[in-house]
Amino acid sequence: MTEYLLLLVSTVLINNFVLVKFLGLCPFMGVSGKLETAVGMGLATTFVMTLASASSYLMEHYILIPLNIAYLRTLAFILVIAVVVQFTEMVIRKSSPTLYRLLGIFLPLITTNCAVLGVALLSINERHNFIQSIIYGFGAAAGFSLVLILFAAMRERLVAADVPTPFRGVSIAMVTAGLMSLAFMGFTGLIKI
Protein backbone atom coordinates (compact mmCIF):
# COMPACT_ATOMS: atom_id res chain seq x y z
CA MET A 1 0.00 0.00 0.00
CA THR A 2 2.85 2.37 0.85
CA GLU A 3 4.42 1.65 -2.53
CA TYR A 4 1.25 2.78 -4.30
CA LEU A 5 0.99 5.95 -2.21
CA LEU A 6 4.63 6.79 -2.92
CA LEU A 7 4.04 6.26 -6.64
CA LEU A 8 1.02 8.57 -6.55
CA VAL A 9 2.72 11.36 -4.56
CA SER A 10 5.91 11.20 -6.60
CA THR A 11 3.99 11.32 -9.88
CA VAL A 12 1.82 14.26 -8.81
CA LEU A 13 4.41 16.44 -7.09
CA ILE A 14 7.98 15.33 -7.74
CA ASN A 15 7.91 14.01 -11.32
CA ASN A 16 5.16 16.30 -12.56
CA PHE A 17 4.51 15.74 -16.26
CA VAL A 18 4.30 19.45 -17.11
CA LEU A 19 6.95 20.99 -14.88
CA VAL A 20 9.55 18.20 -14.85
CA LYS A 21 9.00 16.09 -17.96
CA PHE A 22 7.72 19.03 -20.09
CA LEU A 23 4.84 16.98 -21.49
CA GLY A 24 1.45 18.56 -22.13
CA LEU A 25 2.71 22.11 -22.59
CA CYS A 26 0.28 22.93 -25.42
CA PRO A 27 -2.91 22.59 -23.34
CA PHE A 28 -1.03 23.97 -20.32
CA MET A 29 -0.48 27.27 -22.13
CA GLY A 30 -3.58 27.17 -24.34
CA VAL A 31 -6.38 26.35 -21.90
CA SER A 32 -5.06 28.09 -18.81
CA GLY A 33 -6.53 31.50 -19.66
CA LYS A 34 -9.71 30.92 -17.65
CA LEU A 35 -10.08 28.91 -14.47
CA GLU A 36 -13.41 27.36 -15.50
CA THR A 37 -11.94 26.01 -18.73
CA ALA A 38 -8.83 24.75 -16.94
CA VAL A 39 -10.92 22.80 -14.42
CA GLY A 40 -12.94 21.20 -17.22
CA MET A 41 -9.84 20.35 -19.23
CA GLY A 42 -8.17 18.97 -16.10
CA LEU A 43 -11.11 16.68 -15.37
CA ALA A 44 -11.34 15.49 -18.98
CA THR A 45 -7.59 14.89 -19.16
CA THR A 46 -7.62 13.06 -15.82
CA PHE A 47 -10.30 10.72 -17.07
CA VAL A 48 -8.54 10.16 -20.41
CA MET A 49 -5.04 9.67 -18.97
CA THR A 50 -6.19 7.21 -16.32
CA LEU A 51 -8.26 5.19 -18.76
CA ALA A 52 -5.57 5.37 -21.47
CA SER A 53 -2.91 4.14 -19.06
CA ALA A 54 -5.01 1.14 -18.05
CA SER A 55 -6.04 0.41 -21.65
CA SER A 56 -2.47 0.68 -22.88
CA TYR A 57 -1.32 -1.82 -20.26
CA LEU A 58 -3.98 -4.27 -21.39
CA MET A 59 -3.15 -3.66 -25.05
CA GLU A 60 0.56 -4.24 -24.41
CA HIS A 61 0.25 -7.39 -22.31
CA TYR A 62 -2.71 -9.10 -23.96
CA ILE A 63 -2.33 -8.16 -27.63
CA LEU A 64 1.05 -6.69 -28.59
CA ILE A 65 3.38 -9.02 -26.66
CA PRO A 66 1.47 -12.29 -27.29
CA LEU A 67 1.26 -11.54 -31.02
CA ASN A 68 4.91 -10.43 -31.06
CA ILE A 69 4.04 -7.02 -32.53
CA ALA A 70 5.42 -4.78 -29.80
CA TYR A 71 7.03 -2.63 -32.49
CA LEU A 72 3.51 -1.28 -33.19
CA ARG A 73 3.23 -0.01 -29.60
CA THR A 74 3.13 3.71 -30.39
CA LEU A 75 0.56 3.34 -33.16
CA ALA A 76 -1.59 1.02 -31.04
CA PHE A 77 -1.46 3.40 -28.07
CA ILE A 78 -2.46 6.34 -30.28
CA LEU A 79 -5.48 4.36 -31.49
CA VAL A 80 -6.42 3.44 -27.91
CA ILE A 81 -6.10 7.08 -26.84
CA ALA A 82 -8.23 8.24 -29.80
CA VAL A 83 -11.01 5.84 -28.79
CA VAL A 84 -10.86 6.96 -25.15
CA VAL A 85 -10.95 10.63 -26.18
CA GLN A 86 -13.95 10.07 -28.45
CA PHE A 87 -15.76 8.35 -25.58
CA THR A 88 -14.88 11.25 -23.25
CA GLU A 89 -16.04 13.79 -25.82
CA MET A 90 -19.42 12.05 -26.15
CA VAL A 91 -19.84 11.97 -22.35
CA ILE A 92 -18.98 15.68 -21.97
CA ARG A 93 -21.24 16.67 -24.89
CA LYS A 94 -24.19 14.88 -23.26
CA SER A 95 -23.52 15.84 -19.64
CA SER A 96 -22.24 19.43 -19.98
CA PRO A 97 -22.81 21.23 -23.30
CA THR A 98 -21.42 24.45 -21.81
CA LEU A 99 -18.13 22.78 -20.90
CA TYR A 100 -18.08 21.13 -24.31
CA ARG A 101 -18.30 24.56 -25.99
CA LEU A 102 -15.72 26.07 -23.61
CA LEU A 103 -13.16 23.36 -24.31
CA GLY A 104 -13.76 23.73 -28.04
CA ILE A 105 -10.89 22.46 -30.15
CA PHE A 106 -8.83 21.41 -27.12
CA LEU A 107 -11.07 18.43 -26.38
CA PRO A 108 -10.27 16.52 -29.59
CA LEU A 109 -6.68 17.69 -29.23
CA ILE A 110 -6.35 15.57 -26.07
CA THR A 111 -5.71 12.79 -28.58
CA THR A 112 -2.47 14.48 -29.62
CA ASN A 113 -1.54 15.65 -26.12
CA CYS A 114 1.93 14.26 -25.64
CA ALA A 115 1.28 13.81 -21.90
CA VAL A 116 -1.42 11.23 -22.63
CA LEU A 117 0.82 9.22 -24.94
CA GLY A 118 3.75 9.82 -22.60
CA VAL A 119 1.97 8.32 -19.59
CA ALA A 120 1.16 5.18 -21.57
CA LEU A 121 4.68 4.74 -22.93
CA LEU A 122 6.47 5.62 -19.68
CA SER A 123 4.26 3.29 -17.68
CA ILE A 124 5.21 0.40 -19.97
CA ASN A 125 8.90 1.39 -19.95
CA GLU A 126 8.95 1.51 -16.15
CA ARG A 127 7.44 -2.01 -16.10
CA HIS A 128 4.45 -1.15 -13.91
CA ASN A 129 1.88 -3.82 -13.17
CA PHE A 130 -1.80 -3.12 -13.90
CA ILE A 131 -2.57 -1.40 -10.57
CA GLN A 132 0.64 0.64 -10.71
CA SER A 133 -0.22 1.60 -14.29
CA ILE A 134 -3.61 2.95 -13.22
CA ILE A 135 -2.09 4.82 -10.27
CA TYR A 136 0.67 6.21 -12.48
CA GLY A 137 -1.87 7.39 -15.04
CA PHE A 138 -4.09 8.94 -12.39
CA GLY A 139 -1.12 10.55 -10.63
CA ALA A 140 0.23 12.02 -13.85
CA ALA A 141 -3.23 13.34 -14.70
CA ALA A 142 -3.78 14.73 -11.20
CA GLY A 143 -0.40 16.47 -11.37
CA PHE A 144 -1.26 17.87 -14.81
CA SER A 145 -4.65 19.08 -13.53
CA LEU A 146 -3.17 20.58 -10.37
CA VAL A 147 -0.58 22.57 -12.29
CA LEU A 148 -3.10 23.58 -14.97
CA ILE A 149 -5.62 24.86 -12.40
CA LEU A 150 -2.99 26.69 -10.33
CA PHE A 151 -1.56 28.27 -13.47
CA ALA A 152 -5.02 29.32 -14.69
CA ALA A 153 -5.76 30.95 -11.32
CA MET A 154 -2.48 32.84 -11.48
CA ARG A 155 -3.11 33.94 -15.07
CA GLU A 156 -6.53 35.28 -14.10
CA ARG A 157 -4.88 37.29 -11.34
CA LEU A 158 -2.23 38.54 -13.77
CA VAL A 159 -4.90 40.02 -16.04
CA ALA A 160 -5.88 42.42 -13.24
CA ALA A 161 -2.28 43.05 -12.14
CA ASP A 162 -0.18 46.01 -13.23
CA VAL A 163 2.27 44.12 -15.44
CA PRO A 164 4.81 46.16 -17.43
CA THR A 165 3.89 46.33 -21.12
CA PRO A 166 6.79 44.21 -22.46
CA PHE A 167 5.87 41.38 -20.07
CA ARG A 168 2.14 41.21 -20.83
CA GLY A 169 0.66 38.10 -22.41
CA VAL A 170 2.85 35.10 -23.13
CA SER A 171 5.97 36.64 -21.56
CA ILE A 172 4.54 36.88 -18.05
CA ALA A 173 2.89 33.47 -18.51
CA MET A 174 6.30 31.90 -19.22
CA VAL A 175 7.88 33.65 -16.23
CA THR A 176 5.01 32.45 -14.03
CA ALA A 177 5.37 28.88 -15.32
CA GLY A 178 9.10 29.02 -14.54
CA LEU A 179 8.41 30.19 -11.00
CA MET A 180 5.87 27.39 -10.57
CA SER A 181 8.50 24.91 -11.72
CA LEU A 182 10.93 26.28 -9.15
CA ALA A 183 8.27 25.99 -6.45
CA PHE A 184 7.63 22.35 -7.35
CA MET A 185 11.36 21.65 -7.16
CA GLY A 186 10.93 22.08 -3.41
CA PHE A 187 9.14 18.72 -3.36
CA THR A 188 12.22 16.92 -4.73
CA GLY A 189 13.53 15.84 -1.33
CA LEU A 190 10.09 14.75 -0.12
CA ILE A 191 10.51 11.09 -1.07
CA LYS A 192 13.74 9.11 -0.88
CA ILE A 193 13.80 6.12 -3.20
UniProtKB/Swiss-Prot annotation:
TM stretches of this protein: 5-25, 39-59, 63-83, 102-122, 134-154, 171-191
Disulphide-bridged cysteine pairs: none
Keyword Cell membrane set for record: yes
Localization per Swiss-Prot or TrEMBL: Cell inner membrane
Membrane topology: Multi-pass membrane protein
Family under the similarity heading: Belongs to the NqrDE/RnfAE family.
Function: Part of a membrane-bound complex that couples electron transfer with translocation of ions across the membrane.
Top-level taxonomic group: Bacteria
Gene Ontology, cellular component aspect: plasma membrane
Protein name: Ion-translocating oxidoreductase complex subunit A
Gene: rnfA
Source organism of this protein record: Aeromonas salmonicida (strain A449)
NCBIfam families membership: PRK05151.1 (NF003481), rnfA (TIGR01943)
A matching Pfam family: Rnf-Nqr
Subunit relationships: The complex is composed of six subunits: RnfA, RnfB, RnfC, RnfD, RnfE and RnfG.
InterPro entries reported for this sequence: Ion_transpt_RnfA/RsxA, NqrDE/RnfAE, NqrDE/RnfAE_oxidrdctase
Coiled coil region boundaries: none
EC class: translocase
A biological process from GO: electron transport chain
Major subcellular site: membrane
Enzyme Commission number: 7.-.-.-
UniProt keywords, alphabetically: Cell inner membrane, Cell membrane, Electron transport, Membrane, Translocase, Transmembrane, Transmembrane helix, Transport
ATP-binding in keyword set: no
